């Protein structure tokens, strides 16, 4: 399974993936690592397919890279 696509280039970051369950698992991973500032997954209307969630605080590369989908 592919890893979620994390984009933190703007003031509010976002995470994209074709499967909602991967984002739910990513949320659990964030919570286990003490990160609680994110939205719930929603359909990705900008891309027209897949799912996305918002990040309201910058993630470290270690947290992103330690996630296994």
Segments and roles (model prediction):
Residues 19-22, 56-62:
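Helix N-cap motif at beta-to-alpha junctions
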Residues 32-54:
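Acidic, low-complexity, intrinsically disordered interaction modules
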Residues 2-32:
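N-terminal acidic leader/helix
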Residues 30, 63-69:
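Short amphipathic alpha-helices in soluble, non-transmembrane regions
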Residues 25-26, 42, 63:
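Intrinsically disordered, low-complexity segments enriched in polar/charged small residues
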């Amino acid at each position: 399974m592919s890893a979620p696509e994390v984009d933190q280039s703007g003031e509010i970051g976002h995470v994209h993936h074709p499967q909602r369950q991967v984002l739910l698992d990513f949320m659990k991973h964030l919570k286990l690592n003490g990160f609680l500032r994110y939205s719930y997954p929603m359909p990705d209307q900008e891309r027209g397919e897949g799912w996305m969630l918002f990040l309201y605080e910058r993630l470290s590369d270690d947290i992103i890279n330690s996630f296994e989908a």
